[in-house]
Amino acid sequence: MGKRCYLVTFRQIDPFFVIDVEKPSKPKVLGYLKIPGFSGYLHPYDDNHIIGVGRENTNVKISLFDVSDVSAPTEMSKYVMRGGWSDTPVLSDHKSFLFDRSRELLVFPVTIQGWEKYPEWQGACVFSISLSKGIMFRGGISHQEPYPSQLEEDYFVRRTLYIDEVLYTMSNKKIKMNNMENLEPINEISL
């Protein structure tokens, strides 16, 4: 972003680096932060804040980093998915990541084993994200049958988008429409 580069290494303790790249022949580490886990995908929130999606132990972790003081970046908020294990395609496919700062909206697909009353769950996880409130889980939208004995890959949510006040989630077999405010179902289309 601009004259700065943000990156992480993939270790058990995740150094989040802020690097000055104004002179490409002489990059310089301005600051770093060591925290548990790692961020496999970094996305700008604004000029002084970065969203990180990655892992902490065996679960998906979302971080909001404050880089306004480049010499001492901080993790100002984080959310770690509950359950025994979780994964997200965001770590290998940035197009599965939906973010709109003006709506405080963050949405992406997650697969979870051992989550609440479900032995397995897959769907779009919806979060609110802001500098004042941090990261908060709002709910999940799945295309799977309730309480499946096995998840069906054709019903894995792959993409999300919104138009006006409707959130659309898409899998190979279905498109669901939900109210953006309360996530209540509006309609669905089988493909």
Task: Spell out what each predicted region is.
Residues 1-191:
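Feature marking well-ordered beta-strand scaffolds used for ligand recognition
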